[in-house]
């Protein structure tokens, strides 16, 4: 074999690798929170708790959080499986998602959230306009709730994660 024949395979591999890096740089994969899941049985599953409190009253998340995107049916990476305080993080691989990512799904329009009031024994769905409230976020750590000043710096959602979203009327 000549030198040219020996050099051809490494050159082809080098060009293919460089092409892959260029494609990934200019066309990155979408953020996990933008993805619609194909099924409800992916390998990475985390269940976190998020307590909602509005003017001192405990509220629950509805069972349709993370079930649609842009008005069409879509199972999002962060969603609720039933009415309550538990969110389900599900993906094909381990992923680090925070309370900020949850709020991008829970309040897609960044102005309203839907809550459930079951204080009377029956579920009453309410749409809450966030602009009417002072909103505080915190997470439970070392026997107390720690205020989150910047949602992007919150700890990742995990099976032991407990957050509190407190809304107080302005």
Question: Regions from the language model: what does each represent?
Answer:
Residues 2-170:
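Ubiquitin-like/PB1-type beta-grasp interaction modules and other compact soluble beta-rich domains
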């Amino acid at each position: 074999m000549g030198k040219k024949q020996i050099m051809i395979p490494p050159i082809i591999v080098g060009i293919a690798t460089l092409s892959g890096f260029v494609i990934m740089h200019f066309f990155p994969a979408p953020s996990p929170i933008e993805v619609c899941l194909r099924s409800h049985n992916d390998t990475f599953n985390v269940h976190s708790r998020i307590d909602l409190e509005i003017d001192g009253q405990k509220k629950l998340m509805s069972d349709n959080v993370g079930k649609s995107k842009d008005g069409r049916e879509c199972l999002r990476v962060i969603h609720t499986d039933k009415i309550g305080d538990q969110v389900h993080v599900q993906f094909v691989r381990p992923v680090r998602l925070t309370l900020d990512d949850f709020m991008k799904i829970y309040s897609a329009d960044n102005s309203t959230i839907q809550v459930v009031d079951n204080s009377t024994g029956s579920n009453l769905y309410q749409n809450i306009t966030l602009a009417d409230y002072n909103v505080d976020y915190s997470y439970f750590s070392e026997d107390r709730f720690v205020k989150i000043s910047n949602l992007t710096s919150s700890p990742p959602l995990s099976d032991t994660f407990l957050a509190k979203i407190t809304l107080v009327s302005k």
